[in-house]
């Protein structure tokens, strides 16, 4: 955090996201995997951007359902970081043979509830299993998938809900 401030690569957060960010840091002291659930429009992209900025020297994989959301996160970061790889969920399927080559210290998943879909979920699970020491953070406004009422926090994140704002 201090290093990101001094380098000028700091992402300011509103108080509710600052509280979420502190909860993430506390959560990662006990667990390597967890989630933040916040309502639509509350700034989850900025929360991820802050995490990226604060870990800019480490390898980070960022997954989101589409290019628009990935671009939103990139814009919120505000600067280019060579150690960050941005991928859509579809790329997990399209480039599945490459998933074993993806290496990360941190895996960030925006709109993680989409991984309740079996094909994406299994591809994501491969990436997580191939990076057993990576910290994994998911964000979503809707963690429960309506078909079958699947709780994706329990299914993919060991039930670790670091912060919730609805």
Question: How would you label these PLM feature ranges?
Answer:
Residues 1-35:
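Conserved pre-motif I regulatory segment
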Residues 24, 47-55, 123:
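Hydrophobic residues on the short alpha-helix immediately C-terminal to a glycine-rich phosphate/catalytic loop
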Residues 30-51:
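Walker A/P-loop
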Residues 41, 65, 141-142:
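Conserved H-loop
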Residues 59, 83, 104-106, 132-137:
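Loop/turn-to-beta-strand initiation segments
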Residues 63-103:
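Inter-Walker segment of RecA-like/P-loop motor cores
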Residues 110-112:
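Walker B catalytic acidic pair
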Residues 114-166:
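Post-DEXD/H (motif II) to motif III coupling segment of the RecA-like Helicase ATP-binding lobe
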